[in-house]
């Protein structure tokens, strides 16, 4: 799927401290370096502290198509909501069309979330990222990344693992086993 400009667009809605920014960077690099797409990834956040809203934007297109837009993603093909409470804010669901996929970190079922999201059509994927992160001693963002990769369907999980290893390996090599388990469970359990 592409929009009228030739891009597949993704938006993450999160809270500072949950790792959406680094998740977007890993996903963007996996698409560009691992899968051969052209792409971009950037985040928008206020005061760079835990608890404040964070939005991450990712665009992919074919290798022969330049990425010439740096504006926020307004009509994502995939929306990932890193904290269920963000649903209460009206702008989280802005631009979601009937064919969109929404991935939510929640204990609720897709049927329970659909009216909350005011989403009459489209695909809702749910992952209890907090529970899995606690069980696997990792962060929510790694579990969400696995779920997002599964929902996308066009980025290889092994490529994401490789990029995550390169991102965290030098500084946090002792945590990579936990991060990989979180990625795997996010991918399998959405």
Located regions from the model:
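Active-site cofactor/cluster-binding pocket
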Residues: 1-190
């Amino acid at each position: 799927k592409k929009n009228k400009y030739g891009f597949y667009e993704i938006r993450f809605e999160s809270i500072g401290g949950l790792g959406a920014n680094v998740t977007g960077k890993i996903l963007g690099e996996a698409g560009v370096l691992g899968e051969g797409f052209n792409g971009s990834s950037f985040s928008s956040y206020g005061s760079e502290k835990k608890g404040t809203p964070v939005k991450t934007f990712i665009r992919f297109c074919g290798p022969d198509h330049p990425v010439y837009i740096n504006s926020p993603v307004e009509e994502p093909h995939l929306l990932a909501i890193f904290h269920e409470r963000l649903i209460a804010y009206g702008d989280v669901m802005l631009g979601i069309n009937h064919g969109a996929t929404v991935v939510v970190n929640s204990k609720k079922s897709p049927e329970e979330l659909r009216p909350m999201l005011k989403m009459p059509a489209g695909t809702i994927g749910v992952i209890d990222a907090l529970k899995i992160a606690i069980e696997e001693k990792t962060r929510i963002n790694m579990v969400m990344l696995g779920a997002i990769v599964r929902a996308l369907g066009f980025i290889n999980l092994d490529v994401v693992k490789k990029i995550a290893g390169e991102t965290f390996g030098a500084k946090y090599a002792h945590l990579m086993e936990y991060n990989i388990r979180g990625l795997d469970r996010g991918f399998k359990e959405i």
